[in-house]
């Protein structure tokens, strides 16, 4: 927010696969971008497999009620991209309280991803911290063509627990919709809607007073056989070793979902990073190289 006016930051990204100039047998991905304040794209990096890593910077330092963010990503055929954030996103206590909005206005983010055939996109923002009284909602829509792969991992902290802060009347809402174009038309792969608030945070059948929630989703490029899925889930459960929190995972018709509830953002990120590496192996891709912007990485 600037002055009394809320932000509406917009970021549009296009990923394009091209042949490497120094090796005609290799492909790399380049990008085109257009952003409005407070969004800014920092310098892109290339992974060993030619994947384009794009760090997205939110220069305002946080969100308050009424602020809006819009992210649109188009991944061209056979492109490979990883979009992350430069720092944790903060959602401050809400403003704009009125008779119509007694708890204040919501900060919001809309993300739309379009993946062409054989595209591979990883959406891996850093932690989101909802301050006391903060209101945040997001909607993510993913459109996949055949053999496209989409992977997302998000970690949310409800309240600044280190400062003894609770969520109070704050809340976090999320809607994720993934559909794929098939020979018989558009098929839904996942529709996932969540809301976390103080009641859910305190309820033993909800968050059980644990302040951190994480969600990992992978829409695979091809259906996984029963044997491959069984092995993947078994390995993901083994990967929970020596990490704090409650962790569970399950298969989709064509992919995987994993959830984390616990005290540690670092534990959530470490588990998801291990699963991320498993999915790279199944896609016959290089071992993930965590973006340099991420803190607290495993050795």
Swiss-Prot record:
Entry annotated with the keyword Cytoplasm: yes
Annotated GO CC locations: cytoplasm
Domain of life: Bacteria
Keyword Cytoplasm assigned: yes
Predominant cellular place of this UniProt entry's protein: cytoplasm
Keyword line: Chaperone, Cytoplasm, Nickel insertion
MF-aspect GO terms: nickel cation binding
Pfam family, one: UreD
Localization per Swiss-Prot or TrEMBL: Cytoplasm
Function summary: Required for maturation of urease via the functional incorporation of the urease nickel metallocenter.
Subunit architecture: UreD, UreF and UreG form a complex that acts as a GTP-hydrolysis-dependent molecular chaperone, activating the urease apoprotein by helping to assemble the nickel containing metallocenter of UreC. The UreE protein probably delivers the nickel.
Record family assignment: Belongs to the UreD family.
Protein name listed in UniProt: Urease accessory protein UreD
Annotated source species: Prochlorococcus marinus (strain MIT 9303)
